[in-house]
Amino acid sequence: MSNSWWEITVLCEPSLEETVFWRLEDFGCSGTATAKKQSSLEVKAYIPEIKAQLLDLEALSLWLKQDALILGFPEPVSHWQLMDEEDWASSWKQHWQISEIGDRFLICPAWLNPPENNQRLVIKIDPGSAFGTGTHPTTQLCLESLEMRLSSHPEPKIIADIGCGSGILAIGAILLGAKKVYAVDTDPLAVNATRSNRHLNRINPENLAINQGSVEELLELIPDGVDGIVCNILAETIIALMPEINRLAKPTTWGILSGILVTQAQAVTDILEPQGWTVAALWKRQEWCCLQIRRALD
């Protein structure tokens, strides 16, 4: 049936979540969602039947096992089933509910309403196939870091969000009072998701500029640099991008870096300090960490 979807379920170690997300996205999946299953994590993702044959799914299962082996984790267990479009549209959404993050944020799926008498800043999100629902520890750490940074320094800021995903961090920064956020992502699906969520949260495009690309695009848009940088992507990509990110920075610029496993923190720190950055704080959650950095003062 042309309107059928494969529902792919992966049971894995929690530490593999971001790797599994990446692999499923690279495979072409949409609507990824996670749920805790005792000490494991269940990841569900969906792809149209016409885009994947059984041999493709078998190959995906093998790639997931190879990814886990390389990282030193137990092999994930994968299975799949066909479902019609109506079931797909509702199935993955069942796993995602309203959640509080930090002291000020409430993450609300687009199809739900926030509770009455809510006093928190509401971020409404429909992620589509983009990463960033607020359930991942790295997203939570970044939002909490933004909350601390922008609450303690309330003057208007210009911020760059590198690898914006669903736009959740950019939107959070605007709600906390950032003057303007420039969001970029190399994935066109992420760019579209961020634009949709900008509209969903009724944010003026003048306050949240969204472009496909990476740091080079930001350097053209913001030649005078930014006050803050948020970057929730893989550690290897952060390391590769730092020479360009340095060009975005002013002497007073701060940064929030995540997507980094605790075991990778030292490698990231080692390349930051020679390039003029100081790690002011390191927050951990599960196997993940977030580095709060600032320019080193001579």
UniProtKB/Swiss-Prot annotation:
It comes from Microcystis aeruginosa (strain NIES-843 / IAM M-2473). Its main location: cytoplasm. Belongs to the methyltransferase superfamily. PrmA family. This is Ribosomal protein L11 methyltransferase. The gene is prmA. S-adenosyl-L-methionine binds at T139, G163, D185, N232. Keywords: Cytoplasm, Methyltransferase, S-adenosyl-L-methionine, Transferase. Methylates ribosomal protein L11. It catalyses: L-lysyl-[protein] + 3 S-adenosyl-L-methionine = N(6),N(6),N(6)-trimethyl-L-lysyl-[protein] + 3 S-adenosyl-L-homocysteine + 3 H(+). One of its GO terms (molecular function) is protein-lysine N-methyltransferase activity.
